[in-house]
């Protein structure tokens, strides 16, 4: 916690008595030494911060558990540390803080140099239909920071520049550099040197010689086999499309030329099979890429139409199903209401049937009783009438 609190002091505005910015340049793989000195001797604490803002050392106490950071010297007035095997990750601004009656700040900007590799020279012989020949030279070096300077040293000490090409890697810091030169005339014993100059070399130069003697010998051998095929050591056909410098070289002299028309003619001559092949390959790739893109677009369009038709069919089926479900629900409700009505009427009929039957029985009994009574009365009256005449007589 207290390491973090002390690290945050770097980002908070402080009352700095002085602010110094030093610049230190170190080569990749070497050891970086950082020294912080103060004139105060009492109640002083010294702290080194990494470019990321984290504490490296507070007095003699290490804060980062890394073997790259070592304590060289600590006293009341000095704190010296070292960073071993420096890489591009260690590049940036390091800060020293003096904690006393006031906070003093010292900053050191560290720049890491990456020295280039030993250069290599490649050659390509171009032969045109009219019999003229020229040699394309390419000098390449890899992995440097900053980009190096490449020159060509001709036979009698004449140093010229070629056409530079820088290609940076993904980090945007490391650079791969090449230089191209066209030799339109040269002798069998001529020699050309590719020279690399860089800050990390401290005045030294990286030199790669190229002798035309070997090229002429190979050329004579190839002339016996075929007179029209171009000879290539290890240079790709794409390199021919880049603009290059043109020179003429003889055995004991070197004269620079700047004939743009001949250079363009040598580069764009349709008789060169390598260039024609490269153009044909590029055109074929472009056509195949366009055809593939068109086919993919057409397939995506067809798939989109199929999906839309499927969605429309699904919606139509859903509407039909919804209507059918509504009709079935209405029929079910009607059937249920009809069943309820029939049950109610049947229950009413069943409840009225016993009552009517009892009424009929009651009426039948009354009728039979009344009939019996009437017949009895009639019989009595009949008996009386029969006896009256006899008494009268």
UniProtKB/Swiss-Prot annotation:
UniProt motif (PDZ-binding) ranges: 390-393
Region (Disordered): 218-280, 333-356
Pfam families, per database record: C2-set_2 (PF08205), V-set (PF07686)
TM region positions: 290-310
Extracellular face residues: 17-289
Keyword field: Adaptive immunity, Cell adhesion, Cell membrane, Disulfide bond, Glycoprotein, Immunity, Immunoglobulin domain, Membrane, Repeat, Signal, Transmembrane, Transmembrane helix
GO molecular function: signaling receptor binding
Keyword Acetylation: no
Composition bias type Polar residues, residue spans: 247-256, 270-280
Database matches in SUPFAM superfamilies: Immunoglobulin
Signal sequence bounds: 1-16
Compartments, record wording: Cell membrane
Acidic residues composition-biased segments: 218-228
All residue ranges annotated as the Ig-like C2-type domain in the record: 119-208
Cytoplasmic topology ranges: 311-393
Domain Ig-like V-type intervals: 17-111
Effect of inactivating the gene: No visible phenotype. In the small intestine mucosa and under steady-state conditions, severe reduction in the number of intraepithelial CD4+ CD8+ T-cells and, partial reduction in the number of lamina propria and intraepithelial CD8+ and CD4+ T-cells. In intestinal CD4+ T-cells, expression of gut-retention molecules Itgae/CD103 and Cd69, and gut-homing molecule Ccr9 is reduced. Development of lymphocytes and myeloid cells is normal. However, in older mice, the number of CD4+ and CD8+ T-cells is increased in lymph nodes and blood.
GO cellular component, one term: plasma membrane
Membrane topology of this protein: Single-pass type I membrane protein
Family stated for the protein in its record: Belongs to the nectin family.
Subunit composition and interactions: Monomer. May form homodimer (via Ig-like V-type domain). Interacts (via Ig-like V-type domain) with CADM1 (via Ig-like V-type domain); the interaction competes with CRTAM homodimerization and CADM1 homodimerization. Interacts (via PDZ-binding motif) with SCRIB (via PDZ domain 3); the interaction promotes CRTAM and SCRIB polarization in a subset of CD4+ T-cells.
Annotated function: Mediates heterophilic cell-cell adhesion which regulates the activation, differentiation and tissue retention of various T-cell subsets. Interaction with CADM1 promotes natural killer (NK) cell cytotoxicity and IFNG/interferon-gamma secretion by CD8+ T-cells in vitro as well as NK cell-mediated rejection of tumors expressing CADM1 in vivo. Regulates CD8+ T-cell proliferation in response to T-cell receptor (TCR) activation. Appears to be dispensable for CD8+ T-cell-mediated cytotoxicity.
Listed name of the protein: Cytotoxic and regulatory T-cell molecule
Chain's gene name: Crtam
């Amino acid at each position: 916690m207290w390491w973090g609190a002390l690290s945050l002091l770097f980002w908070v505005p402080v009352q700095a008595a002085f602010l110094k910015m030093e610049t230190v340049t170190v080569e990749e793989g070497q050891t970086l030494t950082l020294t912080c000195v103060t004139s105060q001797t009492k109640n002083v604490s010294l702290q080194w911060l990494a470019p990321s803002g984290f504490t490296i050392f507070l007095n003699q106490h290490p804060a980062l558990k890394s073997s790259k950071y070592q304590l060289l010297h600590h006293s009341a007035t000095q704190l010296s540390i070292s960073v071993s095997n420096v890489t591009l990750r260690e590049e940036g601004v390091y800060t020293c803080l003096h904690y006393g009656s006031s906070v003093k700040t010292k900053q050191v900007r560290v720049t890491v140099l990456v020295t280039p590799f030993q250069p290599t020279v490649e050659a390509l012989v171009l032969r045109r239909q009219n019999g003229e020949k020229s040699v394309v030279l390419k000098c390449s070096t890899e992995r440097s920071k900053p980009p190096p300077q490449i020159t060509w040293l001709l036979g009698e000490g004449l140093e010229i520049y070629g056409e530079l090409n820088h290609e940076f890697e993904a980090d945007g810091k490391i650079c791969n550099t090449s230089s191209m030169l066209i030799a339109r005339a040269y002798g069998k014993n001529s020699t050309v040197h590719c020279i690399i100059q860089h800050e990390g070399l401290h005045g030294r130069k990286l030199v790669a010689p190229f002798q035309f003697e070997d090229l002429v010998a190979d050329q004579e051998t190839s002339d016996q086999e075929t007179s029209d095929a171009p000879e290539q050591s290890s240079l790709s056909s794409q390199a021919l499309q880049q603009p290059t410098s043109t020179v003429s070289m003889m055995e004991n002299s070197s004269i620079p030329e700047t004939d743009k028309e001949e250079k363009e003619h040598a580069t764009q001559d349709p008789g060169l099979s390598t260039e024609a092949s490269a153009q044909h390959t590029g055109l074929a790739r472009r056509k195949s890429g366009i055809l593939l893109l068109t086919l993919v677009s057409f397939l995506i369009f067809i798939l989109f139409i199929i999906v839309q038709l499927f969605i429309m069919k699904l919606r139509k089926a859903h509407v039909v199903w919804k209507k059918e479900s509504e009709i079935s629900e209405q029929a079910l409700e009607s059937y249920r209401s009809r069943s309820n009505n029939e049950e109610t009427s049947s229950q009413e009929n069943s409840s009225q049937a016993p009552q009517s039957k009892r009424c009929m029985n009651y009426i039948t009994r009354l009728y039979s009783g009344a009939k019996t009574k009437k017949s009895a009365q009639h019989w009595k009256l009949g008996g009386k009438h029969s006896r009256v005449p006899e008494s009268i007589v």
